[in-house]
C-alpha cells in the first residue's frame, strides 16, 4: 500500500501524486513544485509573435508577456515547470528546442538554459487552413466553395486545452511503453 505524504510538499514529489485531491483527479501534465531555480532564456527564432504559456501546478495554462519575432527574454523558472508556446494571434502551436513541451533543467556553471522557439513544419493542409483563417472571417467560412469537411476543419481553431489533452494522452502512452522523456511528470 502506498505511503501517504506527510506534507503537501512531499506529495508533490511522490510518484502517483495525480491521485484524487479535493475531490478531483490531478492533471497529468502540470508543473512540479521543485523549488529548484532555473534561469532560462526564451529565444523567439520564429517570424511570429510568441505567447509563452506556463502550465501551473493544476495543469492550467498561464499566459506570460509576448515575445516579438527575433527577440529573447530571461525567465526565472524552476526545474519541473512545463512551458508551451503559441502564436499570440492565431494560437497555432510552435516548437521549443524541436519539441512541443519545454521543461527547464538545472543550470550548469550558472549558465542559462536556452529555449529556442521555432515554427514547426506544418502539413500543407494545416498551412492552408491558417492562411484561409487569416483571410476569411469565421462567419463567412461556409460561403466558400469547398468540400464540407473543410468547413469543420476551418471552424476547429487551434486550442491549447485540446493540445494539452493530446499531449497528456501521448504522455500516458509513452509512460506505458517506458519511453517518457526525463523531466515530464
From Swiss-Prot:
Stretches the record annotates as Disordered: 1-29
Biased composition (Basic and acidic residues): 1-24
GO molecular-function terms, A-Z: DNA-binding transcription factor binding; enzyme binding; molecular adaptor activity; protein serine/threonine kinase binding; protein-containing complex binding; transcription corepressor activity; transcription elongation factor activity; ubiquitin-like ligase-substrate adaptor activity
Principal location listed in the UniProt entry: cytoplasm
UniProt-listed GO biological process terms: amyloid fibril formation; angiogenesis; blood vessel endothelial cell migration; camera-type eye morphogenesis; ciliary body morphogenesis; endothelial cell differentiation; extracellular matrix organization; eye pigmentation
Pathway(s) served: Protein modification; protein ubiquitination
InterPro entries: VHL_alpha_dom (IPR024048), VHL_alpha_dom_sf (IPR037139), VHL_beta_dom (IPR024053), VHL_beta_dom_sf (IPR037140), VHL_sf (IPR036208), VHL_tumour_suppress_b/a_dom (IPR022772)
Keywords associated with the record: Cell membrane, Cytoplasm, Endoplasmic reticulum, Membrane, Nucleus, Tumor suppressor, Ubl conjugation pathway
Region span, Interaction with Elongin BC complex: 123-132
GO cellular component, one term: Cul2-RING ubiquitin ligase complex
One Pfam family in the UniProt entry: VHL_C
Subcellular location: Cytoplasm; Cell membrane; Endoplasmic reticulum; Nucleus
Disulphide linkage map: none
Signal peptide: none
Bilayer topology term: Peripheral membrane protein
Protein's job: Involved in the ubiquitination and subsequent proteasomal degradation via the von Hippel-Lindau ubiquitination complex. Seems to act as a target recruitment subunit in the E3 ubiquitin ligase complex and recruits hydroxylated hypoxia-inducible factor (HIF) under normoxic conditions. Involved in transcriptional repression through interaction with HIF1A, HIF1AN and histone deacetylases. Ubiquitinates, in an oxygen-responsive manner, ADRB2. Acts as a negative regulator of mTORC1 by promoting ubiquitination and degradation of RPTOR.
Quaternary data: Component of the VBC (VHL-Elongin BC-CUL2) complex; this complex acts as a ubiquitin-ligase E3 and directs proteasome-dependent degradation of targeted proteins. Interacts with CUL2; this interaction is dependent on the integrity of the trimeric VBC complex. Interacts (via the beta domain) with HIF1A (via the NTAD domain); this interaction mediates degradation of HIF1A in normoxia and, in hypoxia, prevents ubiquitination and degradation of HIF1A by mediating hypoxia-induced translocation to the nucleus, a process which requires a hypoxia-dependent regulatory signal.
Recorded domain comment: The Elongin BC complex binding domain is also known as BC-box with the consensus [APST]-L-x(3)-C-x(3)-[AILV].
Family, as annotated: Belongs to the VHL family.
Protein name in the entry: von Hippel-Lindau disease tumor suppressor
Protein species of origin: Rattus norvegicus (Rat)
Lineage: Eukaryota, Metazoa, Chordata, Craniata, Vertebrata
Recorded name of the encoding gene: Vhl
Amino acid at each position: 500500500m502506498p505511503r501517504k505524504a506527510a506534507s503537501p510538499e512531499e506529495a508533490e514529489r511522490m510518484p502517483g501524486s495525480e491521485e484524487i485531491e479535493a475531490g478531483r483527479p490531478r492533471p497529468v501534465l502540470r508543473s512540479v513544485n521543485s523549488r529548484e531555480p532555473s534561469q532560462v532564456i526564451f529565444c523567439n527564432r520564429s517570424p511570429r509573435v510568441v505567447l509563452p504559456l506556463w502550465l501551473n501546478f493544476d495543469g492550467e495554462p498561464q499566459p506570460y508577456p509576448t515575445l516579438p519575432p527575433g527577440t529573447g527574454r530571461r525567465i526565472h523558472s524552476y526545474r519541473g515547470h512545463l512551458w508551451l508556446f503559441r502564436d499570440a494571434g492565431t494560437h497555432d502551436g510552435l516548437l521549443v528546442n524541436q519539441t512541443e513541451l519545454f521543461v527547464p533543467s538545472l543550470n550548469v556553471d550558472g549558465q542559462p538554459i536556452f529555449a529556442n522557439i521555432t515554427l514547426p513544419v506544418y502539413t500543407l493542409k494545416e498551412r492552408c487552413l491558417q492562411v484561409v483563417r487569416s483571410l476569411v472571417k469565421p462567419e463567412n467560412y461556409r460561403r466558400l466553395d469547398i468540400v464540407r469537411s473543410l468547413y469543420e476543419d476551418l471552424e476547429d481553431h487551434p486550442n491549447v486545452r485540446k493540445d494539452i489533452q493530446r499531449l497528456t494522452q501521448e504522455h500516458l502512452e509513452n509512460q506505458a511503453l517506458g519511453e517518457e522523456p526525463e523531466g515530464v511528470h
